[in-house]
UniProtKB/Swiss-Prot annotation:
It is a single-pass membrane protein. One of its GO terms (cellular component) is photosystem II. It is found in: Cellular thylakoid membrane. One of its GO terms (biological process) is photosynthesis. Keywords: Membrane, Photosynthesis, Photosystem II, Thylakoid, Transmembrane, Transmembrane helix. HAMAP family: PSII_Psb30_Ycf12 (MF_01329). The chain crosses the membrane at residues 12-32. The gene is psb30. This is Photosystem II reaction center protein Psb30. NCBIfam families: PRK13686.1. The keyword Nucleotidyltransferase does not apply. It comes from Microcystis aeruginosa (strain NIES-843 / IAM M-2473). A core subunit of photosystem II (PSII), probably helps stabilize the reaction center. Belongs to the Psb30/Ycf12 family.
Length: 39
């Protein structure tokens, strides 16, 4: 458990969250365009 505590999880979670947002943005735009472009 000490090794797990040594890994600082907060920046890892933040990087994962930012990566999800960066991937979700274009995905939502692509999905809207694919469904006909109407919001």
């Amino acid at each position: 458990m000490e090794l797990f505590a040594a890994l600082n999880l907060e920046p890892i979670f933040q990087l994962t969250f930012v990566a999800l947002i960066m991937l979700a943005g274009p995905f939502v735009i692509f999905l809207l365009a694919f469904r006909g472009g109407d919001l």
